[in-house]
From Swiss-Prot:
GO molecular function: DNA ligase (NAD+) activity; metal ion binding
The enzyme's E.C. designation: 6.5.1.2
Protein name: DNA ligase 2
Gene Ontology BP annotations: DNA repair; DNA replication
Gene name for this UniProt entry: ligA2
Classification via NCBIfam families: dnlj, PRK07956.1
Family that this chain belongs to: Belongs to the NAD-dependent DNA ligase family. LigA subfamily.
Organism: Deinococcus deserti (strain DSM 17065 / CIP 109153 / LMG 22923 / VCD115)
């Protein structure tokens, strides 16, 4: 460790590294970012600065030295021919100039050289994909994944308009890279329909695109109206292009959708002007974008400049500034969710931000309101967090009207009047009354939603009607409804009633993960429900599972495992499940295939191996293992290659079994796992 660094400095580094890694997983693997892009950029920049000052702290799995996230075990992993890298960022013209000067030094060129011709492109906020062609025929399409290994999504990508399946006259291997996105218009239309049906809303267009592309059923993907823009080539046999601008022309000539906002210019001053003009125009884009990308135009110079461990030296992302506006906080309401959580909501004087009208913003919890000292009548500064979700940044106290008073958080449920509770150490306040009409409504609405049991025809209005008339108290009562009862409701009718009953009947044999999600357990959404279904295969097996067995499922932490176990053991939950079964609920059981053989095992990889570490990590995770960066008492095995270093010492200190590649092959063979490049051997440990 550097002598100038104190133990506290190193502790702060480890904490920051863990925080950035957590946000990477939320963004790349769970499609659920918790902070805005600019907040993430600030954290990542701080971590890079610390690693630049203390290179002895840096390990291979540093979250700012690696790319993307682990491929999902739900899709077949596929290795890219050439890595799909990330991009480094700049935030103003001075930083752009410094980047050009650094690039000039790496190429042994003067900073003002005429060779510095750049192509500017829009940085679309979507999901990166790679299309692989062999002799002109599309073989597969994959997500970026960790940059080396992605998820096979060929059938899903082929639902996107404008994807050529054949390229006449082309020989050899070709990789075409682009961005899949959900347009702002389709995002708004989806959420408008979801709101009408009472189903979950998409958080932002990027999440919508990622979720649609990762649908197992391509026909579901097709309904989301995804689009794509293509902008680069990886392997490019037979493509005669000398510059990035010629690559874009070649792509357009072959029928690939390309951006109409690309320009070619000379030097960083012109690049900064391009960025300024695109910043002003971004509200007119049909897609969300978080910046521009400035690329060195000559491909020969790109190859000469090369790459760092995570990004090309010849390209940079120039991030858009975050647009902020002032508006007035007109009122604060408190809603009650399906778990009983009280959710405060700010109602704002409508303002236009980045092309859409903002009139509401979440206020999270009581502490958030108190810390910001938010008062009705205040002038507040609002932005779109991550470009989409409205967020109050601060109060303009100098504009505060006289006689305003602090907001008083309710001590009784605004829906049922029951006294609310707040556990020590918990930021959230809850209504503990299970009969609370708001909770009942939200639980039933969630149960029938698109992401749960997907009962079409039961929207928000019908849920309100069946609750208010006393026909339904919980989800199981839905399956006891009769045609006469439904037809007798306002705006009912025989035809509508029969349609609802048919949809309810069809839902009885939905896949197991849908029922798990529909039960509405805390910490369980679509992704965790699918993981639980894959791991346990049947509802009975899940009901018998211990917290330790649940925690062993990839993606589950201890908090989630304890929460799920407690929820499933609750007498009210058990009664609901039994009543659903009595009504004929028989979910389709899930085959426990890949993703279970190594469940419960925690691996750490270190040293030089015969295959890329990222590929081995992805393949182990696809078989159900968890791969982490540090050796602890919870580590099942350390996989050690040449020059293993301090992790090997730590494993021996903790008596963690150590495997070389041959011993790993033996373990995998015994578990029924075949991983390419890993052969079984009689060897056991090193």
């Amino acid at each position: 460790m550097d002598q100038a660094a104190s133990p506290d400095d190193h502790a702060r580094y480890l904490a920051l590294r863990a925080e950035v890694a957590r946000h990477n997983r939320a963004y790349y693997e769970q499609d659920a970012p918790e902070i805005s892009d600019d907040e993430y950029d600030a954290l990542a920049r701080a971590l890079r600065d610390m690693e630049a000052r203390h290179p002895e702290w840096v390990e291979d799995d540093s979250p700012v030295q690696t790319i993307g996230g682990a491929p999902s075990a739900a899709f077949e992993p596929v290795a890219h021919l050439t890595p799909m890298t990330s991009l480094d960022n700049v935030f103003d013209a001075d930083e752009l100039r410094e980047w050009q000067e650094k690039l000039a030094r790496s190429l042994n060129l003067p900073p003002e050289s005429d060779d510095f011709t750049f192509t500017g492109e829009i940085k679309i906020d979507g999901l990166s994909v790679n299309l692989y062609y062999l002799d002109g025929t599309l073989q597969w399409a994959a997500t970026r994944g960790n940059g080396r290994v992605g998820e096979m999504v060929t059938a899903q990508v082929l639902t996107i308009p404008g994807i050529p399946q054949h390229l006449d006259g082309l020989k050899g291997q070709l990789e075409v890279r682009g961005e899949v996105y959900l347009s702002r218009a389709d995002f708004a239309a989806f959420n408008a329909q979801a709101e009408e049906l009472g189903t979950p809303l998409l958080k932002n267009p990027r999440n919508g695109a990622a979720g649609a592309l990762r649908q197992k059923d391509p026909e579901v993907t097709r309904t989301r109206n995804l689009k794509a823009i293509f902008y680069s080539l990886g392997r490019r046999d037979g493509v005669e292009a000398r510059t990035q601008s010629e690559v874009l022309q070649w792509l357009a000539g072959r029928g690939f959708p390309v951006s109409h906002y690309s320009e070619t210019f000379r030097g960083y001053v012109a690049a900064a002007d391009y960025h300024r003009r695109m910043t002003e125009a971004r509200s007119n884009f049909e897609f969300d974008a978080d910046g521009t990308v400035i690329k060195l135009d000559p491909l020969a110079l790109q190859e000469e400049a090369g790459f760092t461990s995570r990004a090309p030296r010849w390209a940079i992302a120039f991030k858009f500034p975050v647009e902020q506006v002032e508006t007035v906080l007109e009122s604060i309401t408190v809603n009650v969710g399906r778990t009983g959580k009280l959710a405060p909501l700010a109602h704002l004087a409508p303002r236009l931000i980045e092309g859409s009208t903002v009139s509401k913003a979440t206020l999270h919890n009581e502490d958030y309101i108190r810390q910001m000292d938010l008062r009705v009548g205040d002038t507040v500064v609002v932005r779109k967090s991550g470009g989409v979700i409205p967020q109050i940044m601060r109060v303009v106290t100098e504009k505060r009207p006289e006689k305003t008073t602090p907001f008083v958080f309710p001590t009784y449920c605004p829906e049922c009047g029951h006294e609310v509770t707040r556990a020590e150490g918990d930021a959230n306040t809850y209504c503990p009354n299970p009969a609370c009409p708001a909770q009942r409504f939200e639980r039933i609405r969630y149960f029938v939603s698109r992401g749960a049991m997907d009962v079409r025809g039961i929207g928000e209005k019908l849920v309100i009607q069946v609750i208010e008339t006393g026909l339904v108290r919980d989800a199981a009562d839905l399956y006891l409804l009769t045609a006469e009862q439904l037809a007798g409701l306002e705006r009912g009718g025989e035809k509508k009633a029969q349609n609802v009953l048919a949809q309810l009947e069809a839902s009885k044999t939905r896949p197991l993960w849908r029922l798990i999600n529909a039960l509405g357990m805390t910490h369980v959404g679509e992704r965790n429900a699918q993981a639980l279904a894959r791991a346990f295969g049947s509802l009975d097996a899940l009901l018998r599972a211990t917290p330790e067995q649940i925690e062993a499922v990839p993606g589950m932490g201890k908090v989630t495992a304890v929460s799920v176990s407690a929820a499933l053991a609750d007498p009210t939950m058990r009664n609901l499940i039994e009543r659903l079964r009595a009504a004929g609920m028989s979910p389709e059981e899930t085959q426990t295939v890949r993703g279970e053989q190594l469940a419960g095992l925690n691996f750490v990889i270190t040293g030089s191996l015969s295959q890329p570490r990222d590929e081995l990590k992805a393949l182990l995770e696809a078989a159900g293992a968890r791969v982490t960066g540090s050796v602890t008492r919870k580590t099942s095995y350390l996989i050690a290659g040449q020059d293993a270093g301090s992790k090997l010492d730590r494993a021996r200190e903790l008596a963690v079994p150590v495997l070389d590649e041959a011993a790993l092959g033996t373990l995998l063979h015994q578990r029924g796992v075949q991983l390419p490049g890993v052969q079984a051997s009689a060897a056991s440990t090193v």
